[in-house]
Amino acid sequence: MDKKSSRLRRATRARKKIQELGVHRLVVHRTPRHIYAQVINPEAQVVAAASTVEKSIKEALKSTGNVDAAKAVGKAIAERAVEKGVTVVAFDRSGFKYHGRVAALADAAREAGLQF
C-alpha cells in the first residue's frame, strides 16, 4: 500500500463516519501549490467554497502553498459558511495529517466563527 492509497483509505473511513452523523462537513484538500476548502451539506451539495486559486485570495498572498495561505482560506471559508447560516461542521481532513497547512486552516476557521 503506497502513501496515496493509505490517505484515501483514511479519508473514506472518516467520510463514512461523518455521513452517519448527518452534519455539514468542512472538506480540505491540499496540493503542493494550493489549498482548497468546501463546506458540504449532508445531501452532498456545496454550501461554500474557498481556495488559493481564487483571485481575491491569491492577490493578498505572496505564495499560495504555505501556512499563511491556509490561514487566509480558513478565514474566508468560515466567513462564507457563517454568511449562509452554517456554524457547526465536522472537519474532514481528507486523510491528510492534522499538521501544518491543514491545522492552520482549521485554526483560522475556528477563529472566524466555525465550530468543530
From Swiss-Prot:
Keywords: Ribonucleoprotein, Ribosomal protein, RNA-binding, rRNA-binding. GO terms for cellular component: cytosolic large ribosomal subunit. One of its GO terms (molecular function) is 5S rRNA binding. InterPro entries: Ribosomal_uL18_bac-type, Ribosomal_uL18_bac/euk. The keyword rRNA-binding applies. It holds the Pfam family Ribosomal_L18p. One of its GO terms (biological process) is translation. This is one of the proteins that bind and probably mediate the attachment of the 5S RNA into the large ribosomal subunit, where it forms part of the central protuberance. Part of the 50S ribosomal subunit; part of the 5S rRNA/L5/L18/L25 subcomplex. Contacts the 5S and 23S rRNAs. NCBIfam families: L18_bact (TIGR00060). Belongs to the universal ribosomal protein uL18 family. This is Large ribosomal subunit protein uL18. It comes from Shewanella amazonensis (strain ATCC BAA-1098 / SB2B).
